[in-house]
Amino acid sequence: MTQTLRDICWCGNTELTEFSPDYLACSECGTLVSKTGLMTEQLRIKDDNHDFYGKEYWLSYQTEHYGFPDIRQRARQDLPERCLYWLRTLMTYKLPPGKVLELGCAHGGFVAMMGWAGFEAMGLELSPWVVEFAQQTFNMPIFLGPIEDQQLEPESFDAIVLYDVMEHLPDPVATMSYGASLLKEDGIFIVQMPNYEEGKTYSEMVAQKDHFLDQMKSIEHIHLLSRRGASKFFKNLGFEFMQFEQQLFKYDMFFVASRQPLVPYTDEQISDSLLKSPSGRMVQALLDKSSDFNQLQVQHQNIQVQYQKSENSRAELMNIIEQKAQEITSLSPVSATVTNDLQHPQSQLAKSQEKIQHFQKNQLQQIQNQLNETEANLKVINVEIAAMKTSKFWKLRTLWFKFKRFVGIPTDNE
């Protein structure tokens, strides 16, 4: 498919810079502009079997290129998921029996959901086959062709919703301006589209495997707006009041735009509106179950967060244990060296103690021998003294001392 090169942003800026092989970047509004996206005339299906947005886009192209379910599967899967999510947001700001138009309604499931809730709902699609499929599947008013081709009454709609559509518009200003003319003064747009986060280069996105790369489908995603760009776009249309809601998918933005301040309805007001009809009661029951499921999801996410924190703590502790083990391993040689060094002086100390004990033992033995010898000598002396006391000499000595005392001569101690 040969495409005309596009070199102008929706905001009118022509000084676009290279962003990637397929996209240019606008510094004025933060939008990525496809170089080779489809042109306005290519939106009108002339050959439903071969034109880009014809029958095969819904039956095989999205499945083969993006891994999405085909339109038959989506008609079942989307009802309890995104359709309920979108309806909850719509009813936060508009209640039945408001008149609502969905651009690019695909299988028509959300149009049906709005109808069951009590809205006067209708949808638009480009492929004759898809329009027929949606009509037969959900029995809702689905019309063929771009919004500009429809004969719709100006200022007659309470809301126009477009989910994953605005990025496909070759001339979003013309299309959305026409849509704005169909809205009542207090009418709103509700939009879901990819959210380009400014500040990242293409090379950084590739290196980080950024999830937004999947949205850079240059043939069909012609304008990828940032939040700044989306705000500027709708303010230029006169819709100065914007409320960014929680997006269903992380790569998207989801918001409500209005000319007047947005005043949300309460859950009680929404429920009262739905309970007025049998089909509305069914929708209320689905919303209740959806709320229960969402709470379980939040609990599951919290558990996952706690589990991840526990895993992170466990990993940190394991790292600490491994570090300490490495420190112990590195200290083992030092410990062995110190042990060896300690063992050597301990051996010397043991030998010294052995020598001291041996010396002390010898000394004690010598002293004991000397004591024994002295004791033996003392016994000999005592024997000699005893012998002397019995001898004649001793007797004469005794008489001599007695004589000296008798004559008054001083004597030494006997």
Which residues make up each language-model segment?
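Conserved N-terminal segment of class I S-adenosyl-L-methionine
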Residues: M1-Y163, V173-Y178, A207, Q246, ...
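A short His-aromatic
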Residues: D164-H168
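Compositionally biased, charge-rich terminal segments
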Residues: Q365-L396
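Low-complexity, charge- and small-residue-enriched intrinsically disordered regions
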Residues: F401-E414
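S-adenosyl-L-methionine-dependent methyltransferase catalytic module, highlighting the catalytic core
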Residues: E148, L169-D288, G408
